[in-house]
Amino acid sequence: MANQEIFDKLRDAIVNQNVAGTPELCKEALAAGVPALDIITKGLSVGMKIVGDKFEAAEIFLPQIMMSGKAMSNAMEVLTPELEKNKKEGEEAGLAITFVAEGDIHDIGHRLVTTMLGANGFQIVDLGVDVLNENVVEEAAKHKGEKVLLVGSALMTTSMLGQKDLMDRLNEEKLRDSVKCMFGGAPVSDKWIEEIGADATAENAAEAAKVALEVMK
């Protein structure tokens, strides 16, 4: 089976909420010699992007998102050990504090980005979902003086708006200059990042890892 055919099957498994079949497809792909990173970036993440777009367009709703998320989680259980094997050694890229915005419990992209950052040499502090901005600021303050990257995600426009409040709080607490700030999620755009004074965004988890490394140079 050609790699593109494998990637298409992985994409469709996520879009069609194939909870049981997705991890099996991942095992088959690994057995065929496809790298775990490619399975994620060229197959699963493509499916998640489609799911996110459909959700934004109100073509699917929360139950479908959750089922696609479960399929993704099951896939990552198979792939995370493979990513760990290939983890980049050497100097730590920095500390990534990852979280999902207050009012948002959609953690699919968040978990994927967190895994990818860990695989690319970042130490991880995962604050989880529905995180208050004051908790993010508090965590950032604990690590003042270190190389810190805040990585927040929001699937909904309403929760995305809290990212501006977070930037304001970081400025008020005089922490903004000591951290880099990166936000992602379906509604987040380059224009929004510029408007709130953050540092970066990314289209998907693999790109997020690359952008994060660039931002932390």
Swiss-Prot record:
GO-annotated molecular function: cobalamin binding; cobalt ion binding; methionine synthase activity; monomethylamine methyltransferase activity
Pathway(s) annotated for this protein in UniProt: One-carbon metabolism; methanogenesis from methylamine
Pfam families the UniProt entry points to: B12-binding, B12-binding_2
Binding residues for methylcob(III)alamin: 106
UniProt entry tagged with the keyword Repeat: yes
GO biological process: homocysteine metabolic process; methanogenesis; tetrahydrofolate metabolic process
Sorted UniProt keywords: Cobalt, Metal-binding, Methanogenesis, Repeat
A GO cellular component annotation in the UniProt record: cytosol
PROSITE patterns on file: B12_BINDING (PS51332), B12_BINDING_NTER (PS51337)
Record note on quaternary structure: Can form a complex with MtmB.
Family: Belongs to the methylamine corrinoid protein family.
PANTHER family the UniProt entry points to: METHIONINE SYNTHASE
Protein name per Swiss-Prot or TrEMBL: Monomethylamine corrinoid protein 1
Gene name tied to this protein: mtmC1
